Each structure stands twice: as C-alpha cells, then as structure tokens.
Amino acid sequence: MTSTIGLGMPTAPAAVLAPRRKTRQLMVGSVGVGSDHPVSVQSMTTTKTHDVNATLQQIAQLTASGCDIVRVACPRQEDADALATIAKKSQIPVIADIHFQPRYIFAAIDAGCAAVRVNPGNIKEFDGRVKEVAKAAGAAGIPIRIGVNAGSLDKRMLEKYGKATPEALVESALWEASLFEEHGFGDIKISVKHNDPVIMVEAYRQLAAQCDYPLHLGVTEAGPAFQGTIKSAVAFGALLSEGIGDTIRVSLSAPPVEEVKVGTQILQSLNLRPRKLEIVSCPSCGRAQVDVYTLANEVTAGLEGMEVPLRVAVMGCVVNGPGEAREADLGVASGNGKGQIFVKGQVIKTVPEHQIVETLIEEAMRIAEEMGEQAGSGEPVVTVS
C-alpha cells in the first residue's frame, strides 16, 4: 500500500503575538529595513579592519552563516583607509562603526559604506557636526544609525538622570535624531542598548511609542556565549513578540558566526524567519532508555548544513516520544534497545539502537532530496510504502 504525506513547515509563518510596529523604511545597501521588510540579522567583525584580507574572510564566513548586514570598527585612520575595498568586495552591506573621531564618518561615507553608525555619547562635539554629517549622508543616499549605549551615554543625560535609565537612553537618541531632522535628514535608525535586558526592553518600548524610526535591537556587552544568548533571547523575544524591532545583533563574547546562529534561531522561534532544519529532542530523565544527549548531538552533527525546512524529533522514552515523533516530519521514539522511526506520524520501520543515527540521517537526506525535487511544484511530499 502506498500513500503520500505532506512535509515541511508552513509556507507562510504564523503571525507574531502583536502586529509589527509601523516605521519609516530605509535601505542599507540592498537590505530593506523597517516594518515593510523582514527583521534582519547583523553581526560585527572582530578583525582589525585595516587587515583587509582577514576582515573580508570573516565577512564571507558571516555571509555563509546567514548574516544580512555586517558592521566593522573604524578606530584608526588605517581602518578608514581600508573601508572602500571592504565595502566594494563584501557580499553583504557594510556599516562603519564610528566612535570618538567625526572625520571617520565622512571617510566611511566617501568609501561607499552602506550606512554609518555614530555614537553621540563619545564623538567629539558631535552636535555641532550634525549638519555636515546630514548633508554628506543625504548626498550619498545612505542612512545613519544613532547608537546610544549605556556605557558611553552623553554626559548631559547622566547629569540629568544620574545613570543610564531607559528615559536617559531614549532622550539622548531622540535629541540627536531631532538635530538631523532640523537639517532635513530623516533616514535614521536608532538603538538604545543596555547590558541589563530589563532596562533595555523598557527603553525600546518607550522609544517605539515616541517615534517611527526603525529600531536596531541589542543587549550591549551581553557576555559569554551562554549568558549572552539567554539575555538576548529574553530581551529580543519580549520586544519582537510585541512587534518592536527591525534589525538585531546578538552581542556575544564568541566568534561572530555564533551571533548569527543565535539571532537566526531567535527569529525562527518567533516565526519571523522561515525555519530550516530543527532538531527537537527531549531533555532526558530517569525514564530515558537511550543516551539522548549523544543521540541528539550525533544526529545534529550528521545533518549540519541541511537547508530544508525539516523538523526532526529525537526522543528517549515511550512517554512523550511517540507523540513528539509523530508531530515532527521525521523522528525516533527509543526504548528497549530499539527505535521506531516515524515519518509525519507514520512508523516506517523499527531499527536496533545502534542504527538509529544512521537511519535518521539516511531518511532525512532522502526526504530533503524529494523536497528539493518537488520544490517547484507545490508542497513537498514523501511516498511511504
């Protein structure tokens, strides 16, 4: 007997908990930013920008990992001199990150960067240079991100509020935006970052209520990979589920590619980005009759790089195992030294425990191949005999 089974995630992601906040629209190079465009994932290179080859190599790695926009530091003249080559050869838009020296803003604009991030809290006499910056950026047709950080907040705000409160961050950002608007420049994106996700979330909520600028989300100095992932997921999840946020950067003390992986996973978890491969595995407990940790890790490693929207469930006992496996596109429910292999709710075979990983990988590859072949003719299906 032969039947056909539909596979794959929904073609259109489910709506988030709240409608997307309406914003003005910007173009950062080829990437649209604002409520009419998908939320984009950014990262920042960790190389010395003047080392052009190393920087371009890291940008290539970020591009391959799914990064949409990349930011590069520009603390020295030699870094500014390298921007033109980097901006020209990068496959994704390059944003120059400017602190302290206003002349590097103009160097970045002249170099053809897709946007410039300025920190009004530490650029010398920035308010007095806004007219020049607005004129140069407007002539080049590139946006400016006003990036306010708790750690480098304008001294005037610190004197007024005593510390980096949500109100202080928001007032600083909107003050600088108003100066640009006075000179006819409105292609502005704003960030108000803090290392405390609770303060950060409140700052963005206040900011979102007071303007229509696109917002770049970030928890600054979030920490090592584990801690930073948790902080960013909590903060971004809260805001994005409210429709707030147009670009994100997960700041981790880890390789930049890891930032992109986490950011992408956050968006996928909220159905703000089409899902690709998803491994569902149980946390294990005393009921487990198989080494779930090893099994899940081996399956994940074996399927790394798979681009199809496939949910694979790796379950360790008979309590939730069969149910979870049936809900997935492909799954295994393990117990008594063997595993039942499910494809979209139907058991297709039972294999010995030592063959589970190999069988899951083989079935996933087979399904992926069939999905690829049928991608142009509607929803993918798999034939089960």
Curated annotation (Swiss-Prot):
EC numbers: 1.17.7.3
A GO molecular-function descriptor = iron ion binding
Q: NCBIfam families attached here?
A: ispG_gcpE, PRK00366.1
- Pathway recorded for this protein: Isoprenoid biosynthesis; isopentenyl diphosphate biosynthesis via DXP pathway; isopentenyl diphosphate from 1-deoxy-D-xylulose 5-phosphate: step 5/6
What are the BP-aspect GO terms?
Answer: isopentenyl diphosphate biosynthetic process, methylerythritol 4-phosphate pathway; terpenoid biosynthetic process
- Entry keyword set: 4Fe-4S, Iron, Iron-sulfur, Isoprene biosynthesis, Metal-binding, Oxidoreductase
- Protein name as it appears in the record: 4-hydroxy-3-methylbut-2-en-1-yl diphosphate synthase (flavodoxin)
Protein task:
Converts 2C-methyl-D-erythritol 2,4-cyclodiphosphate (ME-2,4cPP) into 1-hydroxy-2-methyl-2-(E)-butenyl 4-diphosphate.
Reported cofactor(s): [4Fe-4S] cluster
Which gene produces this protein? Answer: ispG
